[in-house]
Amino acid sequence: MDINKMTYAVQSALQQAVELSQQHKLQNIEIEAILSAALNESESLYKSILERANIEVDQLNKAYEDKLNTYASVEGDNIQYGQYISQQANQLITKAESYMKEYEDEYISMEHILRSAMDIDQTTKHYINNKVEVIKEIIKKVRGGNHVTSQNPEVNYKALAKYGRDLVEEVRQGKMDPVIGRDEEIRNTIRILSRKTKNNPVLIGEPGVGKTAIVEGLAQRIVKKDVPESLLDKTVFELDLSALVAGAKYRGEFEERLKAVLKEVKESDGRIILFIDEIHMLVGAGKTDGAMDAGNMLKPMLARGELHCIGATTLNEYREYIEKDSALERRFQKVAVSEPDVEDTISILRGLKERYEVYHGVRIQDRALVAAAELSDRYITDRFLPDKAIDLVDQACATIRTEMGSNPTELDQVNRRVMQLEIEESALKNESDNASKQRLQELQEELANEKEKQAALQSRVESEKEKIANLQEKRAQLDESRQALEDAQTNNNLEKAAELQYGTIPQLEKELRELEDNFQDEQGEDTDRMIREVVTDEEIGDIVSQWTGIPVSKLVETEREKLLHLSDILHKRVVGQDKAVDLVSDAVVRARAGIKDPNRPIGSFLFLGPTGVGKTELAKSLAASLFDSEKHMIRIDMSEYMEKHAVSRLIGAPPGYIGHDEGGQLTEAVRRNPYSVILLDEVEKAHTDVFNVLLQILDEGRLTDSKGRSVDFKNTIIIMTSNIGSQVLLENVKETGEITESTEKAVMTSLNAYFKPEILNRMDDIVLFKPLSIDDMSMIVDKILTQLNIRLLEQRISIEVSDDAKAWLGQEAYEPQYGARPLKRFVQRQIETPLARMMIKEGFPEGTTIKVNLNSDNNLTFNVEKIHE
């Protein structure tokens, strides 16, 4: 018995048989151990053939186990179990060897073991009974005229069924969504497939534009017989490259599998069209030391026209892998698949609408489809139509479906209230005092009312759920009937087609309309319903907002109020800069109302003014107002960009340089948060060439990073701050704080000397911040003290500062050329430091209020006023 003359599957079965013998404490390897191991082998051909012959495999395996248990086990020390082969097991191998010679094979394979077992083993004979000829016929079909010339012959049997899926068969079974449009690309593909040689189209396009859908569309046309005669009998197989590579343990096994697939395709005489998605993976697939990769194995067959192949890949991967191998590239004909426009996407969504309605059991409004196409095109810029629009619709449907499965909020609240009252009732029943009895009586009345309300709501919910279930069932029946009609028309079953088209389908459509009308009449408007089963444009807007962070959904009342009073909110934080606050808040309101220019940022402003007047503070307060956190502000300190080459930090290092994979500080931040406030602080400190990057952002609302990706800035507010002309402002401002026209001109002259005209011309507004007045300082004192009180609140301590003390603080710290920053430092010295010393020295108890007053010597006094009990 030469183990090298056996296939890997037979070798593995013998190894398993040794382990079985050891488990049963048998010195010999019995025939049943070998056959049981063969039956339990993963992807067992032995088992597969018996199953196809309708033999009870589980019972046969149990019979092998029972027979093994009848052999006498040997106990003792130093006994080597499973070291010898029994006489009957030896006969099995010898007979299998004779079958190997009969089949003209080079290795003993599983089918030889099965034929041998049918002749020698009584248990196998009993179960196979009179199916010997059937099994012989199945073995013949499985082998398909092949000979066992390798130790892994199983890969050659039904290779296409193992490593691919029949798209034409899936269309016939109704498993595939309809393909709408793409007629020109499908026709182009058909034209290339009809050539004599090099009849291999490769579909090239961005991810998500519908390359795979074109092949599915071809499969659907083949089923409908809507193709030229030369393609009528064709079938399309999608090759699963990962399945080909997976589990290839031995050298050359991958090549063997691929050869088996290609052989089947070749033997079909052009009937099989092979579709390889992500065809670039073929280049280098399976390549080890000295081995040939899959791409090179395909070349001869592709050139001779023996292999009909459709490939699909993206532009980048085609350039990176296929174009490098010019011999492989010339064997394919390119078909460019462009991204459909919004109108075509809406048509595609309308075609898919019914499938999604049936699958999710919801109703999709047409305006939801239009919104999905338009909003995805406008806001989801890093993906492609129609894929991103289909994803939006699918997600919105899933959201509504999830809501339908749970209780509505109104019923949920009543259920919680009833539970709460029942708990209180059971507690009060144990009390005997009059107050508890009185409360119990009131509570029982309230509980009765709530339970009545609960029953009414529950009944209404059940009724709506039942009606929705009926609608879903009717839609599913209609979908099945339409699928059956397509099958009947394809198979030329005219009688059945006529019955479905003129009888069943119109009747189902009528019943569905009646159900929908009744549901509409009974429930009234959508807003009156307990359960929503309609997907509207609002749901689509919500999903876009979830994905991008950009507020697209309709304004709720609280947000509407917040926007209308945005300037008031900003005024509370930014003192004395009315014009700047109004300009920024107006830009946000325009954007949220949906009337801003869709191709530019929400707003781009240059804030000019002395230090400490609120330029940066306005940007921070805007971020806090819009996003409830200053963290949503992208702050870039332009003093870090003083060198010319520093621009690469904004958009990313060029290819070949360290940090290329990390992307740019600005571009990556905006890609992650497309709706944000960008603050470019102290812009005059940056090198002038850095501003050239800003030209496209300010004008077109986009910027291309170092990797060639376009980053969308259309939903950002860009604020630049600068101190240019601050000296002119300080010297020439009126006592009232107003900026004169001559001062404004002088500042603009300074500005033009520094910035190029093309930068200034693209700004929405250049805002001059006026120096702070003494009145503004007293308001800022209040702000600083409020923030101090918030910090003290954590320690349950509060501070009260008298008006005299506040006025003194504002006056003493007033330095027009430095703005509000000296005031902050002055408050730290005069209030925070003495207070901190007192807290450490005396340790105030919780609830302490400290009063700060100004004495006659113009010094602040601290008094511990009261302690709250």
Swiss-Prot record:
InterPro entries: AAA+_ATPase (IPR003593), ATPase_AAA_core (IPR003959), Chaperonin_ClpB (IPR017730), Clp_ATPase_C (IPR019489), Clp_N_dom_sf (IPR036628), Clp_R_dom (IPR004176), ClpA/B (IPR001270), ClpA/B_CS1 (IPR018368). It is found in: Cytoplasm. ATP 1 binds at G205, E206, P207, G208, V209, G210, K211, T212. GO terms for molecular function: ATP binding; ATP hydrolysis activity. Residues 340-549 are annotated as: Linker. Residues 772-869 are annotated as: C-terminal. GO terms for biological process: cellular response to heat; protein refolding. Pfam families: AAA, AAA_2, AAA_lid_9, Clp_N, ClpB_D2-small. Residues 390-524 form a coiled coil. The keyword Repeat applies. Residues 6-71 are annotated as: Repeat 1. Residues 85-145 are annotated as: Repeat 2. ATP 2 binds at G609, P610, T611, G612, V613, G614, K615, T616. Residues 559-771 are annotated as: NBD2. It comes from the Bacteria. Keywords: ATP-binding, Chaperone, Coiled coil, Cytoplasm, Nucleotide-binding, Repeat, Stress response. One of its GO terms (cellular component) is cytoplasm. Belongs to the ClpA/ClpB family. Homohexamer. The oligomerization is ATP-dependent. Part of a stress-induced multi-chaperone system, it is involved in the recovery of the cell from heat-induced damage, in cooperation with DnaK, DnaJ and GrpE. Acts before DnaK, in the processing of protein aggregates. Protein binding stimulates the ATPase activity; ATP hydrolysis unfolds the denatured protein aggregates, which probably helps expose new hydrophobic binding sites on the surface of ClpB-bound aggregates, contributing to the solubilization and refolding of denatured protein aggregates by DnaK. PANTHER family: ATP-DEPENDENT CLP PROTEASE, HEAT SHOCK PROTEIN 104. The Clp repeat (R) domain probably functions as a substrate-discriminating domain, recruiting aggregated proteins to the ClpB hexamer and/or stabilizing bound proteins. The NBD2 domain is responsible for oligomerization, whereas the NBD1 domain stabilizes the hexamer probably in an ATP-dependent manner. The movement of the coiled-coil domain is essential for ClpB ability to rescue proteins from an aggregated state, probably by pulling apart large aggregated proteins, which are bound between the coiled-coils motifs of adjacent ClpB subunits in the functional hexamer. This is Chaperone protein ClpB. The gene is clpB.
